[in-house]
Amino acid sequence: MNGKYIYFAIAALLGVLCVQLTFLPFFLLQTLYLYLLYKYKRFMKFQLGLVAVCFLTFFFIGQHAVSTNKTAIPSSTTTFYLQYTEDPKIDGDLLQVQAADARYKEKLLIRYKIQSEQEKDLLKTKTFYHCLCRVSGTLGKPAIAKNPNAFNYRKYLSRKNIYWIIEIQENPLQTCSPMNPSPVELIKQLRYSGINYLESHFPIEIASLSAALLFGDRNLFDPEVLTAYQKTGIVHLLAISGLHVSLLIAMVFYIGIRFGLTRQFMINFLLIILPIYVILTGGSPSVIRSAMMIFLVLLTVKLKARLRLFPLDAISLAFISYLFFNPMVIFDAGFQLSFSVSLVIILSAPYILQGYEKTITRMLATSLVAQLAALPFLLYHYFEVSMIGIIANMVYIPLFSFVYLPGLYLLFIIQFMFGKTPLILISIFRTIISLSNYLIEYLADFTFFRFIPGRPNWFLLIVYIFILLLIFFIWETKAYPKRKVHLFVLIVVLIIFQQGWNWLNPYGEVTMIDVGQGDSILIHLAHDKGTYLIDTGGTMNYTEEKWRERARAFEVGRDVVVPFLKGQGITKIDKLILTHGDMDHIGGAFSIIKELEVKQILMPSVVEPSITELAILEEAKKKNITVIKVSEGDKWIIGENEFDILSPEKNFAGERNSGSIAFIAQLGGVSWFFGGDLDQEGEEKIIKKYPNLKVDVLKAGHHGSKTSSAESFINQISPRIALISVGEKNRFGHPHSEVLNRLRKTNTVIFRTDQQGAITYKFYQGKGTISPYLP
């Protein structure tokens, strides 16, 4: 069976996907797969039968996982008996910890708002394991995705068999009774203690990297540095990868042999230590994969198996085993990246990588192979890839593998054994880590190397995979005519084809993005002829005590609007229209300016700009972005699409909401009114100046506040549809019942982001349809 386990792994994958996604396409694919094995691999009937049995086995495993993926806890439950199963995560004044309910045998996520700095310090020192705790709280469903391409937290937790979040008001350890700890709990407690030990005994630069490489925990990392690693495509180095595990195992094995221990003893020792190491490092997919592969190889050596286990067989068996115990993991980005990249490197090693004799060219080829293998998954999950990662990997992989990994283990051992680490070692590592962090942040700002075509659909994913297979085929075929030219052309096609596809898209769209209590509307014209963003949303920041501050507080521009735009493949904003100076409308502009190319900013012509507007002007100046102060009478036309500014008057000196930019747009055969937070006073001025004004779609002013959308205004413009951008359960009571009643009186169809998520109007040659993201 040497070299054939891969065929069973493919059958297992198809079996699970048949259940998890759509049955018919994957069942037909499995049928075709069996035919290809018979036709080209000369599989006998018995072998084909085994592959079919493997497919059916994993089909039923997947079916069982789907059928049991639901909660048994009644939503009215308020009292719970919990065993904490993971390390607590403390971020500012928020504590989160996973637990298992003793009555329902179901996992839950606990959230607790810490009351004081003293309580926070105390909770950091407490053990959450080997105890049964009684807590009272309110069950709530995890958040769902309310915008296209947004992260679906509810689905993410559901695939981990977590269906509820409990909000508790009292200390989670207040009413607990001790229990006998299990071996797994003891190891997890050791991990948590180790992370806390690093945090309290080393500078944060060393502690954060040590926690990541020794224990698989990235919570100590500076969010800006972590983002830089992600943007440059080398964040995998901050996870405990297969390379790290292999190096560590080789190091331990070598040390054992040098100390006179037998090979058999060391193999037995490593077989015992590997499962412990997986738990100690957090059990990420990359660690589990590499540990399983090494475990299988060591096991065959121990049992003196006649057949050598090749790397391809090891990764195939690891994949099958992993999927057997956790079929839901197939959707985990870490799982997909770990197995796909490792598989492609294993397959390419004898055909591609061995053709490079020089170390540096082999490293470059390996880095390129890994980047190409990861490309479809990176684009699907994160919408962007940095080409600079190919070069960065060549510098950072040796640095992490041969300096950081052994060096940080050494620092930890010295500190633990002697209670003190020589200052010279601390100084050296702190300097090197700071320099490497500075370099990665510098490289992350190279937008030229960032490739952002957006999230590919299924058709585009298939095209990507086809092009990649063609690239690898030509690359490994040494006698292929004009090999280098064809490879270069294919790689260029790989990079530009989705952006070309986006440009050919004949559909335009208007999307009211769900940004909570704020406004942000995208206008994207067909064939990429124009991209306009009306407002950016914004997060209100209130001054808090230092200990309450989160490491990376939620910011709607960075966390909602930018991912939405990147998911659409949008990297350039032709006009950023900031209707007025309120934070909930323009606070996210800083993230937009930082992450995307903004060509022009339109702001209202007012006498007294807000502090936020002045800060945006300063940022625009740094980026050489043209800023235009617009007023009544300004307009622009792109093809059949026309935009006319109705308000404010030039050098407006009144109340800020009254001075909002209000304009009419003709888009997709429909007339639109956009007016920011325009109040009734501003509306009255407009209907007096334009007594014949009629619109099809009204963006309701000020989130449906009763200070906007006056009855006289609605009666005159007679909208067929009203869009209200409003936060769910907001403290202002928006939209106001009076406004809703006014709109209903005129038979206006109302769409609300708090209830329906993003609202999109998609149009083609003067006709279109409007649809909410949520049903």
For the regions a language model picked out, list residue spans one by one.
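Alpha-helical transmembrane segments of multi-pass integral membrane proteins
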Residues: 345-451, 720-725
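N-terminal leader/targeting segments
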Residues: 1-71, 289
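Aromatic-rich juxtamembrane segments at the membrane interface
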Residues: 161-293, 298, 574-577, 600, ...
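Residue-level signal for inorganic ion chemistry
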Residues: 82, 334, 374, 601, ...
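Hydrophobic alpha-helical transmembrane segments
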Residues: 1-5, 180-192, 211-219, 263, ...
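Membrane-interface helix/helix-cap signal primarily in integral membrane proteins
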Residues: 58-232, 236, 559-566, 572, ...
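Non-globular, low-confidence helical/coil segments that flank catalytic cores
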Residues: 122-125, 129, 136, 156, ...
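Hydrophobic alpha-helical transmembrane segments in multi-pass membrane proteins
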Residues: 7, 47-49, 224-390, 453-505, ...
